[in-house]
Amino acid sequence: MRRILNKESDRFTLYPILYPDVFPFYKKAEACFWTAEEIDYSSDLKDFEKLNENEKHFIKHVLAFFAASDGIVLENLAVSFLREVQITEAKKFYSFQIAVENIHSETYSLLIDNYIKDEKERLNLFHAIENIPAVKNKALWAAKWINDTNSFAERIVANACVEGILFSGSFCAIFWFKKQNKLHGLTFSNELISRDEGLHTDFNCLIYSLLDNKLPEQMVQNIVKEAGGVEVEKSFICESLPCDLIGMNSRLMSQYIEFVADRLLECLGCSKIFHSKNPFNWMDLISLQGKTNFFEKRVADYQKSGVMAQRKDHVFCLNTEF
């Protein structure tokens, strides 16, 4: 743990790169940068008004959770990880992630603002942590890991759970609407945001892999399953805000969350505990995979031009055959 948390007083510049495994994550985040203004919300309101009341209720509360949870993630980054982690390459990633999480929060707020015309209801959703028990319970679990009384290793694993598991059921449910060709603005922003969160999850796993003093495997599995993670997400998406409301099968959703959790455990260097298969074949490309994943594929070919290219790719050549 010393390498990560000990201050590098002589590193005020990025180069030379001392952590070649960490730096590419910053470049990936930079390559995938987008803004809320790039999403076309124009047809969403018509689609939203055509939904039944159960579907509307589900979308409203999922967006309320997302809007609130991004604030918690931001707090965790700014108060804890950016301050504690001393690797310059990691600080670059965390700094960029803060900007990206702000964009996620803005996007969810715009969607709520676009869908909900009643001011009182809109304010209730914006203050979901205080007003909506299902959101409050989930947010409280995420928020408690900001507390410095937990070890750094515990908090980095818990943060991986927040970004890798606690969003998974909601992401999956929104892709259910994409499968039905509805809510194009919401579903496209969901593609971009789920890609970003997958990258953030993988980065948490990378930082954990660099720790000298890792947690016992059973403790990691407990954080993922019992202490929060899987059980919290199942409770939210299958009970408090059941995905049955939109026509999805809660049993299969539980299985999907277990599948995602197993992928995360493997990414953290631990054994699977559920051995569940992905029950939604249409989610194969967008589940939170570890190495070669959907986020490498880049949604809708969305990547900043040239950012991930190597220097040799920019060589001007006159003898190329056409």
Swiss-Prot record:
Taxonomic path: Eukaryota, Sar, Alveolata, Apicomplexa, Aconoidasida
PROSITE patterns for the chain: RIBORED_SMALL
Cofactor: Fe cation
Name of this chain's protein: Ribonucleoside-diphosphate reductase small subunit
Assembly information from the UniProt record: Heterodimer of a large and a small subunit.
Signal peptide: none
This protein's UniProt keywords: Deoxyribonucleotide synthesis, Iron, Metal-binding, Oxidoreductase
Annotated catalysed reactions: a 2'-deoxyribonucleoside 5'-diphosphate + [thioredoxin]-disulfide + H2O = a ribonucleoside 5'-diphosphate + [thioredoxin]-dithiol
Catalytic residues in the record: 108
UniProt binding sites for Fe cation 2: 101, 163, 197, 200
Function: Provides the precursors necessary for DNA synthesis. Catalyzes the biosynthesis of deoxyribonucleotides from the corresponding ribonucleotides.
